[in-house]
Curated annotation (Swiss-Prot):
Protein name: Putative F-box protein At1g47915
SMART domains listed in its UniProt record: FBOX
Domain F-box intervals: 7-55
InterPro entries: F-box-like_dom_sf, F-box_AtFBL13-like, F-box_dom, FBL60-like
Superkingdom per UniProt: Eukaryota
Gene3D superfamilies with a match to the protein in the record: 1.20.1280.50
Length: 73
C-alpha cells in the first residue's frame, strides 16, 4: 500500500521567512521561483534585497531600462 508523503518542510514556513531565504539568492533565481505555485508568485514582493544584472536587460537606453525596473517594484 502506498502512503502519502507529508507536506515538505519548506511549505510550512511563513511567507516572511521564505522572503528572507529568497533574498539570499541571485535575483534571477529568486524570480524564477514564482512558477512553483500560486503562493510563490507573490513572495518576490517580500524580498528585501534585489540585485539586477543590467547586462541582461536589453533596452535602447537607460531611461527605458529605468521605466521597466520601476514597473516591477
Amino acid at each position: 500500500m502506498m502512503r502519502t508523503s507529508p507536506r515538505d518542510s519548506i511549505s510550512n514556513l511563513p511567507d516572511e521567512i521564505l522572503g528572507k531565504i529568497l533574498s539570499l539568492l541571485p535575483t534571477k533565481v529568486a524570480a524564477s521561483t514564482s512558477v512553483l505555485s500560486k503562493r510563490w508568485r507573490n513572495l518576490l514582493g517580500l524580498v528585501d534585497n534585489l540585485c539586477f544584472d543590467e547586462s541582461v536587460v536589453v533596452y535602447p537606453n537607460k531611461e527605458e531600462a529605468f521605466k521597466w525596473f520601476t514597473s516591477i517594484l
